[in-house]
Amino acid sequence: MIPVRGLEGRKVAVLGLGRSGLATARALEAGGAEPLLWDDSPEARAKAEGQGFTVTDLTRERAFEGVALLVTSPGIPHLYPAPNPVIARAMAAGVPVDNDIGLFFRSFATRDWDAFDQMPRVVCVTGSNGKSTTTALIHHILSEAGRPTQMAGNIGRGVLDLDPARDGEVVVLELSSYQTDLARALTPDVAVFTNLSPDHLDRHGGMGGYFAAKRRLFAEGGPDRAVIGVDEPEGLYLAGQLSVAPEDDRVIRISAGQKLERFGWSVFARKGFLAEWRKGRQMASIDLRAMPGLPGAHNHQNACAAYAACRTLGLAPRQIEAALASFAGLPHRSQTVGEKGGVRFVNDSKATNVDSAAKALQAFPKIRWIAGGLGKDGGIAALQPHLGSVVKAYLIGHSARDFALQIGATDHEICETMERAVARAAEEAQPGEVVLLAPAAASFDQYPNFEKRGEDFMEKVKALL
């Protein structure tokens, strides 16, 4: 645990008692603060009381008298589409609002570091797609190289549940836009921006607000090194804003398709090969086609981002290459479930938006595509250019009929349920084809989260194997 510093003897309200909320309460208490907890769920409140915490109704009048700070969980809206009433009450009372990420950055460094030979470092990864894989890949590479490392944030543990830093340790954090938007302190040593595509726009008031939330990680006084994906306009803009000149090697540009040879430092993938260029010279080349845990161009972009981040931390190209080869991938992200009769079954349940689904569809030449769920703003019409590899679509969930109207002449069948979609796709698939779950939609119409959707797909597939 990382005790929260600077709030000794102060009352701190905590809103939202999920994983991060309870971890925050423990860290506040360990640092000498008095946490006052609240959640709309009676079950969550009872669980907190069972752990010995004080539960206080933050919805009542004058609830914030004498309170120094409100710490809120990332899933609770603080501005758009409308502020949570408790957050609105805190802001009206002049009480600052923060989250566990902000508390982490104000508390991570300690006096113990004076005795360290090598200062601990923090690497933060943000973006629309590939954050989790990139974060896990950086952590894996560091571990394989023998560097002490911990991983947390939007993946794995809550940040305040981490152990205090060791000599030379690297903490790798995945940060969503919800987390970067509200954190009052963001001071990573290395920051990674993978890409940007429309997502969570209701929470940010539009695309501009969404990009602004991500960009906060790179604010003045932020990272020593920035790794920026430049395959979208926002990444190009951000890299330009952070660079003093094209040869500035504090910014490492990455791409999954473009040649980037003219910049101070770049890492890019083309035709299955990763190349590192620095000041006009090629420094390394890696064959990504031999990496079983990193299929497709989208994973090649993740590999470029992780490679660049690890190079800034002093790892050698061959160390990184060896670790890339041993990376098994993450569940629900281009995850091979099995193969039968020459037909491969792949679970990419995390492909919840158009951009991530497009990248999944580009990874295989012949696809039986299972898609649908709770559609997002804008639908899936933008996927039209990527449907050439789709032999047939099997549509499920709330948006099945809407999706059918948006995929044009692509052969399709409305299946409604995962069970029927898997059965029909498996029945019709031919050797050499891939049955791919890449929903291009949220899961909440039929499942509590994308993980449960992916698990259901895998269960149905394994029953057929």
UniProtKB/Swiss-Prot annotation:
Its main location: cytoplasm. One of its GO terms (molecular function) is ATP binding. GO terms for biological process: cell division; cell wall organization; peptidoglycan biosynthetic process; regulation of cell shape. One of its GO terms (cellular component) is cytoplasm. It comes from the Bacteria. Belongs to the MurCDEF family. ATP binds at residues 127-133. It is found in: Cytoplasm. Its EC number is 6.3.2.9. This is UDP-N-acetylmuramoylalanine--D-glutamate ligase. It comes from Cereibacter sphaeroides (strain ATCC 17029 / ATH 2.4.9) (Rhodobacter sphaeroides). The keyword Cell division applies. InterPro entries: Mur-like_cat_sf, Mur_ligase_C, Mur_ligase_C_dom_sf, Mur_ligase_cen, MurD. Pfam families: Mur_ligase_C (PF02875), Mur_ligase_M (PF08245), MurD-like_N (PF21799). Pathway: Cell wall biogenesis; peptidoglycan biosynthesis. Keywords: ATP-binding, Cell cycle, Cell division, Cell shape, Cell wall biogenesis/degradation, Cytoplasm, Ligase, Nucleotide-binding, Peptidoglycan synthesis. It catalyses: UDP-N-acetyl-alpha-D-muramoyl-L-alanine + D-glutamate + ATP = UDP-N-acetyl-alpha-D-muramoyl-L-alanyl-D-glutamate + ADP + phosphate + H(+). The keyword Cell division applies. SUPFAM superfamilies: MurCD N-terminal domain, MurD-like peptide ligases, catalytic domain, MurD-like peptide ligases, peptide-binding domain. Cell wall formation. Catalyzes the addition of glutamate to the nucleotide precursor UDP-N-acetylmuramoyl-L-alanine (UMA).
